[in-house]
Design a protein with these regions (language model features):
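C-terminal terminal-structure detector
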Residues: 137, 165, 182-224
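A hydrophobic, helix-centered structural microdomain
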Residues: 47-115, 162
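Short, well-ordered beta-strand elements within core beta-sheets of diverse protein domains
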Residues: 63, 145-152, 220-224
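N-terminal hydrophobic signal-anchor/signal peptide
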Residues: 1-68
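A short, structured surface patch at a secondary-structure boundary
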Residues: 129-195
Length: 224
């Protein structure tokens, strides 16, 4: 793990090998008569990083201008349904472990924490579901407009501003909160090497149907 954080290409010589143990992000190579595994860390390549950043900046600026009327309509819908601000800021962990303030359309009621705690007290069987993935299939905090925004992922659109400022990327591991560091385990070091993304592999591979372990696995695969 340490070598993968320092070098863009790492060759591993296993002590033991049995068929079926090769992770799909490594490539078998042969050095002499020895079977080795080559791990390519593409996101440590400065050229790839520069190209990715250029694409992020171009697409986010052009896309933001194109969808501006949609953003205005969404803002009006939020204000008409419930009181409170249109946008919601949340602290997440960004590149290098720095605090990242992500911007989203508000999809919950203003007293969301109070509503959540009351709901969990009245439905103790759902506490385990919440503690496992920090998600509920039928979340009582979410407004009607918010439910639609989340289903279509339109609540993430304001994060284009985070992308323009270089705090996020269009594609990458989803930004996590402090409480999720333990769940990430050894993969957290890999997570902090890149900019979090507006979308990522696990969002297009199953969303809420995936376990947290599967989400981490897909994020790590993308980084490698």
């Amino acid at each position: 793990d340490l070598a993968s954080l320092l070098f863009s290409s790492v060759i591993i010589i296993p002590e033991d090998f049995s068929e079926g143990e090769i992770p799909f992000w490594v490539r078998p190579v042969e050095i002499g008569d020895v079977l080795c595994f080559k791990v390519r860390q593409n996101l440590l390549d400065p050229k790839r990083l520069a190209l990715k950043r250029a694409m992020d900046l171009f697409l986010s600026v052009v896309g933001g201008i194109a969808i501006f009327p949609v953003l205005v309509l969404i803002a009006l819908a939020i204000k008409l349904e419930s009181r409170g601000p249109v946008f919601f800021r949340q602290n997440r962990i960004g590149r290098g472990g720095q605090t990242l303030h992500i911007l989203k359309f508000r999809t919950m009621v203003c007293n969301a924490e109070e509503v959540l705690q009351k709901y969990l007290r009245e439905n103790p069987d759902l506490r385990e579901e919440w503690e496992a993935d920090q998600k509920l299939r039928n979340d009582p905090r979410i407004t009607k407009v918010g439910a639609w925004l989340r289903k279509t992922s339109l609540d993430e659109l304001p994060q284009l501003w985070n992308v323009v400022w270089g705090e996020m990327s269009l594609v990458g591991p989803r930004p996590i909160v402090d409480d999720e560091i333990v769940k990430y385990g050894s993969a957290f070091a890999s997570y902090t090497r890149v900019r979090p993304g507006m979308t990522g592999l696990w969002q297009v591979s199953g969303r809420n149907d995936l376990s947290y372990k599967q989400r981490v696995h897909l994020d790590r695969f993308y980084i490698c």
